[in-house]
Structure formats: structure tokens, C-alpha cells
Amino acid sequence: MGWARLESALGRVPEGVDVEVRWRPYEIHAEVQPEGMPVEDLPYSPEQWAQMQEALRQSAAEEGLEVGKRPKVSNTHRALMAGEYARVEEAERFPAFHEALFKGYFAEGRDLGDPAVVEDIARSAGLDVGRMTKALDGGEYEGAITATTDTARQLGITGTPTFVFDKRFAVVGAQPVEALLQAIDEALKHTEEE
């Protein structure tokens, strides 16, 4: 939802204003084992989990997005590394891959902790899966995930989405489009003052 709202906000930015979006990986649940964590093991009662998921589904529907049922929380470390690979090595395919990962996880309930699932999604986005797998298996993007997650935590970022504008203004969570536009406006004002 955060991504959809950001896209809506960017569509309302005045003509002539350049906004550069830089996606960065952030590992929320590094403690989740590679095989994932059943939702029953989360620190919520079944009722709380059901309410949270229903609220998520309703909010997503308002943005024209679908959220399906997920039987577990995936360990997304490999998917994050694959995203970083795509961003750096095959940048023109990164947006499609990024979107396909979100759709796979949220709408289709796919397990992003399963390397075969990540490879399938990468293939569907047109990535060179052989090259990507070699890079991931070789640990090429391991450090990038750790570094960006550590930096984010040092800045007080504890969840996603978090949008940082002009390295000064943060909008945390899937906030309304108006909140994102306000942050963009504040960043532009500070840029003009400098």
C-alpha cells in the first residue's frame, strides 16, 4: 500500500519537479528462520492476527490491491538480496521484479524464503536467473542488506514502509497520499532555501 500511495503522490507532484526514488532493502524480521514462521507462532492471538489481516485487506482494497492469506511469515533475506541484485545489476528490470515480489507475497501468499519461489519471480520479471543465483549464492549482496538495515536502525527506522525525503523528513507507515505530498513539499521548501 505504501508503494501505491507513493506512486499516487508522485503523480501529483508539479510538472518540472524531479523526484528521485531510491529503494533500499530493510530486513524487518531477521530472526525468522529460513523455513519461515507459522502465523500461529507470532506474538498475537488468533483474533488479533485476523483483525490485523482484515484491516490490511481493507486498506489494500482502497488502493486497488489484493492481500491474500499467508500461512506463515517468510524469511525475506534472499528476496531482499535478489532485489538488491536487480537494482544494481539489472536496473531496468528492478521495478517489475519489486512489484512481482510484493504481489507474490501479499496477494498470492508465496513463500519468499524459498529460493525456487524467488527464482520463479525473478524469471517472470525477466531477470537473468543464473547470474542472479550465482551472485546470491556467492554472498555478493549479503553486506548490502546488513549495511542498509543497520543504517536504517541507527536512523530510528524500525518498520516498512518508511519514506525519507531529502535525507531530512521521514514518513513512516502506509500513510495517506496527502502526508507524502506534505513531506515532498517540505523537502522542496528546504531545497529552495539552500
Predicted regions and their residues:
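C-terminal cap of thioredoxin/glutaredoxin-like
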Residues: 1-19, 23, 84-194
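Structural alpha/beta surface segment adjacent to cysteine/selenocysteine redox centers
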Residues: 3-105
